[in-house]
C-alpha cells in the first residue's frame, strides 16, 4: 500500500475561494515550505505497512474499493463501525477485507440509504459478523437487497433502527454523531444518514449520497459540519458538494468512492472544480484502490493501495505535479507544517 500526500493549501485561501466575507489571518512558520493554518489538523505520510498485517492503530477509517458504490469501515480501540457495504456483488470482498483486519464483531452497522450500491453488501456482512446495532433511515423498501438486509438483521435477533439527528454513539475513544437528515425527502439520496466522527482533534464526515437540498438544510440546521476529511457525496456527482455545504465543512481532504470508467462519469468535473477551488486534496478509489486514514488524535496519515498523480486525481488542476510522494507533518496545537527533513521537528 502506497503512502503519499501533496502540499496543503492554506485555509484562508480555501475560504476566500469560496467567497467568505472575511479572510483569516495567516502566519508563517520558521521552516522551509512551512505555514500556519488556524484550526486545522494536518496529515503526515506514513511508512507503515498496510492495515490487516497485525498492526494496531488507535483509529483508522477505511474506504473500501467497492467500485461504483460505497463502503467505509471505522475502527477505534478495537471497536468497529461499518457504514454501507457496496453492491450485493461486493459482499464477499467486504467480508474478506474485514476478516483480514481481524474483525470479529461490529458494534454498529449503518445503511446510509436504501440504494443497492450502499445496502447491497451489508447482508453478507451481517450474515458473517455479529452486530450490536443496525441503523437505516427506513425500515422497509421494495428492493430485494434491502429486504435481505432486514432479514439478516432479524436473524441476529435485532431490528433495523431509525436513529434521530443528534444521536451520539461511543466507538472506543471516538465519538460518532448523527447530523442528518434533518427533514423528510422524496429523493432517496437526500435521506442519507450523515455521520460526524471525532477522534481527538481530528474529524471526519460521512455523507452517503446526500445531495444539494439536504446539504442546504443541514447547513441551515446549525450542525457542526467542520471536518478534516469529507466523504464526497454521491460518488462525486454534480448533484452533491454544493458551495454552501463545502463552505461549512472546509475539509483538508475529500474522498471519492467511484468505479473505474463508470457509466455516470463520476466524479463530475463540476465537483472536482469546486473541490479544487477550495484547495481540497482529492483521493479517489477508482485510481487509488482502498484508502486508509489513520489518526493519533492530532495528526492523520494516509495510505493508499495504489499510486496516482495529482493530475490524474483532479485532472484539470493547472498546478498538478507529476507525483505526490513527499508529505508535510503537522500538529493541531502548534498549527505548523514541516517538511519531514525539517530540523525543527519535535523528537
Language-model segments: residues:
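A general, composition-driven signal for non-globular sequence regions
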Residues: 6-8, 18, 337
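Alpha-helical interaction segments
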Residues: 21, 225, 235, 327-328
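Mature, structured domains enriched in cysteine- and short glycine motifs
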Residues: 277, 312-347
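Sec-dependent N-terminal signal peptides of Gram-positive bacterial secreted proteins and lipoproteins
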Residues: 11-34
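Non-globular, low-confidence helical/coil segments that flank catalytic cores
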Residues: 2-6, 28-322
Amino acid at each position: 500500500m502506497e503512502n503519499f500526500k501533496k502540499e496543503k493549501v492554506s485555509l484562508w485561501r480555501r475560504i476566500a475561494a469560496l467567497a467568505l466575507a472575511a479572510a483569516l489571518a495567516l502566519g508563517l512558520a520558521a521552516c522551509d515550505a512551512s505555514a500556519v493554518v488556524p484550526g486545522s489538523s494536518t496529515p503526515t505520510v506514513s511508512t507503515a505497512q498496510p492495515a490487516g498485517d497485525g498492526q494496531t492503530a488507535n483509529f483508522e477509517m477505511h474506504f473500501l474499493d467497492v467500485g461504483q458504490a460505497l463502503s467505509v469501515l471505522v475502527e477505534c480501540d478495537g471497536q468497529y463501525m461499518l457504514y454501507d457495504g457496496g453492491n450485493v456483488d461486493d459482499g464477499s470482498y467486504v467480508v474478506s477485507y474485514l476478516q483480514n483486519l481481524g474483525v470479529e464483531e461490529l458494534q454498529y452497522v449503518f445503511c446510509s440509504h436504501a440504494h443497492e450500491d450502499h445496502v447491497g453488501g451489508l447482508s453478507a456482512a451481517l450474515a458473517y459478523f455479529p452486530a450490536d446495532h443496525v441503523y437505516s433511515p427506513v425500515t422497509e423498501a421494495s428492493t430485494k437487497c434491502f429486504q435481505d438486509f432486514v432479514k439478516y438483521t432479524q436473524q441476529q435477533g435485532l431490528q433495523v433502527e431509525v436513529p434521530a439527528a443528534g444521536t451520539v454513539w461511543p466507538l472506543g475513544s471516538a465519538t460518532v454523531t448523527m447530523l442528518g437528515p434533518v427533514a423528510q425527502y422524496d429523493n432517496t439520496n437526500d435521506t442519507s444518514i450523515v455521520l460526524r466522527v471525532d477522534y481527538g482533534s481530528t474529524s471526519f464526515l460521512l455523507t452517503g449520497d446526500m445531495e444539494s437540498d439536504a446539504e442546504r438544510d443541514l447547513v441551515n440546521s446549525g450542525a457542526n459540519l467542520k471536518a478534516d476529511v469529507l466523504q464526497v457525496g454521491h460518488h462525486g456527482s454534480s448533484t452533491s458538494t454544493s458551495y454552501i455545504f463545502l463552505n461549512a465543512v472546509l475539509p483538508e481532504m475529500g474522498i471519492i468512492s467511484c468505479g473505474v470508467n463508470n457509466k455516470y462519469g463520476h466524479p463530475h468535473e463540476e465537483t472536482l472544480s469546486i473541490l479544487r477551488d477550495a484547495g481540497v486534496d482529492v483521493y479517489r478509489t477508482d485510481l487509488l484502490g482502498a484508502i486508509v486514514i489513520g489518526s493519533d488524535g492530532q495528526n492523520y496519515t494516509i495510505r493508499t493501495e495504489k499510486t496516482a498523480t495529482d493530475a490524474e486525481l483532479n485532472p484539470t488542476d493547472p498546478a498538478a505535479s507529476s507525483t505526490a510522494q513527499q508529505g508535510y507533518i503537522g500538529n493541531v496545537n502548534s498549527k505548523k507544517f514541516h517538511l519531514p527533513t525539517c530540523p525543527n521537528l519535535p523528537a
